[in-house]
Curated annotation (Swiss-Prot):
Lineage, uppermost ranks: Archaea, Methanobacteriati, Methanobacteriota, Archaeoglobi, Archaeoglobales
Organism: Archaeoglobus fulgidus (strain ATCC 49558 / DSM 4304 / JCM 9628 / NBRC 100126 / VC-16)
Name under which the protein is recorded: Uncharacterized protein AF_2183
Domain of life from the UniProt record: Archaea
Localization per Swiss-Prot or TrEMBL: Membrane
GO cellular component, one term: membrane
Keyword Transmembrane: yes
Membrane topology of the entry: Single-pass membrane protein
Annotated TM spans: 26-48
Length: 217
């Protein structure tokens, strides 16, 4: 029987936090794989049938997610206002222009990276088959427009999903919580979240633009 042997030279330069981090990654990967396998075994009897559910309920879940995202955005903007009011010396909106500048710089370099790749894809003789694949993909999409995008009746494709969303909004028995935690019809929660988003974004832009003279000299 061969005992476990560890080469100390390979490990003596590894910092403890780094080693713990690596072990944590290995542990999490094993945990996730084990969890997935366990779920597959538990749900195996129920996996005999293909997925099918009420289209209106499915669409309602989509809309509820949209409403929650709008509310989350509004709460984040509200947090910025509170931070700015709490620390009057923070000049929060003035400093946000520094983040804008950083984002513009990164976006500019990212555009150059993408342009370089696209230029090579367009001109390289070694990528002829890849260009052909792009053409075939567009042709495949064009010849299956109804399957992907749907039809005027909303019987298939994305049009069907949008039609079910309309039905979900028209069905006042489908409710969700609004920004104040009150249970209201889905359409009302969506309308309120949309109105709050517009209002908060306008206020945010006003505060941001007000800080331009101090940020840019």
């Amino acid at each position: 029987m061969t005992l476990l042997s560890i080469n100390y030279e390979k490990f003596k330069y590894i910092e403890v936090p780094e080693l713990l981090s690596k072990l944590g990654v290995v542990f999490m990967r094993g945990y996730v794989v084990g969890l997935v396998l366990a779920l597959m075994l538990v749900t195996a009897p129920a996996m005999a049938e293909d997925f099918s559910m009420n289209g209106t309920e499915f669409a309602a879940a989509f809309i509820k997610n949209t409403v929650s995202n709008l509310d989350l955005g509004a709460k984040f903007l509200h947090l910025l206002y509170e931070v700015n009011d709490t620390d009057t010396n923070s000049n929060l909106f003035q400093n946000l222009w520094g983040l804008v500048y950083g984002g513009v710089l990164v976006a500019g370099w990212n555009n150059q990276v993408t342009a370089e790749v696209l230029e090579t894809l367009a001109d390289s003789d070694n990528l002829t088959s890849q260009r052909t694949n792009i053409s075939e993909s567009i042709r495949m999409m064009a010849t299956n427009t109804s399957v992907v995008f749907g039809d005027t009746e909303g019987s298939q494709g994305l049009a069907a999903l949008m039609k079910y969303q309309v039905k979900a909004l028209q069905n006042t028995s489908i409710t969700t919580t609004n920004s104040t935690g009150v249970e209201v019809p889905l359409v009302e929660a969506y309308a309120e979240a949309l109105a709050n988003t517009i209002t908060d974004n306008v206020k945010f832009m006003m505060e941001l633009f007000k800080a331009i003279p101090n940020a840019l000299t």
